[in-house]
A protein has these predicted regions:
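C-terminal motif of bacterial Sec signal peptides marking the signal peptidase cleavage site
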Residues: 19-22
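Bacterial signal peptide processing site
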Residues: 24-27
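A residue-level marker of the well-folded mature domains of exported/periplasmic proteins
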Residues: 34-373
């Protein structure tokens, strides 16, 4: 069974192929790059890729901003690069990015399915509903969505995988770091789109601040602001800078952002006022300018790269399974950043954070995933 889309598209394939040859190439309906071999690599009816030696075709559709966002998309891209390095000629890869308003996400995924890409990864929760529809239409294709809604991935033997993270656990760690670093006993949190996902970051951060403040016998205030209620809230550095400057004016000397590209403004604001920023998703010290880098205390590492890498690898070796897959501290999906740039800033803070990691992974500390009253 080729699936609804495969049947619908099948009658057109010969004509389209001839037309594409005459025109000198196809149309991605978005920004795209391709690499790798030239096999078919279609999956079977379940999530597994079959484990054969043929080249497997893997498509990745980034969210708006694509590669170069120094955050979420770049972390996914790093996972793809790791998979390409490990699997080499076993992979043929194509990368796409939606248009400015994201309205063609499903169109891009469907085009990859029609072109025989056996695994298609959508980067970000905004893909969730579209990718669920595509999975129902293209039953021979395996789909995976980073931060996908769990309610869409209830069938463990389906062709849809939701890759989830315990963001609250890593946010707890950087919250503890903020509590240990603050001199004003006021810290800040700047979120992107206000919703359940980013509330997990807020919840963990507030819990970490509160826990470590309690250990030190202090009371620390957490200021909270969100950049908006639309996807634009993840790509508005000017708004991020405005909110961070407001919090600094209210006494915050450490600010954690969970706001994608908007966070560039948060980091810039902190650096301009000699206050500390905490990055998110990837190690933002590694991509920041030298002037800003020295004010990035750490970053909450959401190992999207590991999740993407593992998903591609399991697809290629035929062990991928549909359903929800969750990555926390215990699974290597969450951490905090330590590097040559922030070693001096952190001082002995890692000693405390590493102890907390063990306590969280072992279940001794339960981190809330919703803000507490």
């Amino acid at each position: 069974m080729r699936g609804v889309r495969g049947v619908r598209a099948g009658a057109l394939l010969v004509g389209l192929a001839l037309a594409a040859a005459a025109c000198g190439g196809g149309n991605d309906n978005g920004t795209g790059t391709g690499s790798g071999g030239n096999g078919n690599g279609g999956g079977s009816g379940s999530a597994g890729g079959g484990g054969s030696t043929e080249t497997k075709k893997v498509g990745v559709v980034y969210d708006i901003g694509g590669r170069g966002d120094q955050s979420f998309n770049d972390s996914a891209a790093a996972g793809l690069e790791a998979a390409k390095k490990e699997l080499g000629s076993k992979l043929e890869v194509k990368e796409l990015e939606p248009n400015a308003d994201g309205s063609n996400r499903k169109e891009l995924m469907d085009s990859l399915a029609d072109d025989g890409y056996g695994l298609i990864i959508g980067v970000g929760f905004l893909f969730s509903e579209d990718i669920a529809k595509s999975a129902k239409e293209s039953t021979d294709t395996t789909f995976a969505v980073v931060d996908g809604f769990d309610t869409l991935c209830t069938q463990p033997n389906s062709n849809l995988i939701c890759l989830g993270f315990k963001e609250q656990e890593g946010s707890f760690l950087v919250g503890a770091a903020a509590a240990l670093k603050t001199k004003t006993n006021t810290v800040g949190f700047v979120g992107g789109l206000e919703g359940d996902l980013i509330k997990k970051f807020q919840a963990g951060y507030e819990a970490g601040v509160k826990y470590e403040a309690g250990q030190k016998g202090k009371k620390i205030k957490v200021l909270v602001d969100y950049a908006g209620n639309t996807p634009e809230a993840f790509r508005n550095p000017a708004k991020g800078k405005e909110l961070a400057l407001k919090q600094i004016g209210q006494g915050a000397d450490v600010i954690y952002h969970a706001s994608g590209g908007t966070g560039a403004g948060v980091i810039a604001a902190c650096a301009s006022k000699s206050k500390y920023a905490i990055g998110v998703d990837s190690d933002q010290s590694l991509t920041a300018s030298p002037a800003e880098r020295k004010w990035i205390l750490t970053s909450m590492l959401k190992r999207v790269d590991n999740a993407v890498h593992q998903t591609i690898k399991s697809y290629v070796d035929g062990t991928a399974k549909g359903g929800v897959q969750t990555f926390g501290l215990k699974e290597g999906g969450i951490d905090y950043a330590q590097n040559q740039y922030n070693k001096q800033l952190l001082g002995d803070i890692p000693t405390t954070l590493d102890q907390l990691k063990q306590q969280i992974a072992g279940g001794e500390i339960k981190v809330p995933d919703k803000p507490q009253a």
